[in-house]
Amino acid sequence: MLRSEKPVAVEDIVNIYKESPSIIITHYHGLTVSQVSSLRESLKSKEAGFKVVKNTLAKIAANQTGLNSIANLFAGPTAIVYSKEPVEMAKLVVNFAKANDNLKIIGGIVDNHVLDEHSIKDFSKLPTLNELRGNIVGLLQAPATKVVGVLQATSSSMARVIQAHASKN
């Protein structure tokens, strides 16, 4: 990389750090081009990205954005995975890493909280924001459904009592 290109590359990484509340740092040594392309396509469908970074530039960008705590994670063949939706991204990366031993999760950061490999794996087991929204809507609808059911049961019970009383007479 030319010296004149380095500030532009640092600025790109700084923008990723600023715009993405969640970043996973990986080692990609041994992944084939088709595997990396497959991962990128999967991430793109979830509005996430995968960027191979030069460690020194990633450290400079981390220091410029106040993410000093992740600077020590940049060693070896490093790529960052970034997204605005942390759980979906974590699920995708963890599943890809399970299927491809050559992708190693090193650590990451979610909403300014540094996570290690195990924390990211645990984090990937959480429900996504859309799943949580669906659960909340379901919980809110459940009482209304029960009230309607009770009202219907009461009216049908009342109708049966009246029918039984009418058939006696």
Swiss-Prot record:
One of its GO terms (cellular component) is large ribosomal subunit. One of its GO terms (biological process) is translation. One of its GO terms (molecular function) is large ribosomal subunit rRNA binding. Signal peptide: none annotated. The keyword Ribosomal protein applies. The keyword rRNA-binding applies. Keywords: Ribonucleoprotein, Ribosomal protein, RNA-binding, rRNA-binding. NCBIfam families: PRK00099.1-1. Forms part of the ribosomal stalk, playing a central role in the interaction of the ribosome with GTP-bound translation factors. Part of the ribosomal stalk of the 50S ribosomal subunit. The N-terminus interacts with L11 and the large rRNA to form the base of the stalk. The C-terminus forms an elongated spine to which L12 dimers bind in a sequential fashion forming a multimeric L10(L12)X complex. Belongs to the universal ribosomal protein uL10 family. This is Large ribosomal subunit protein uL10.
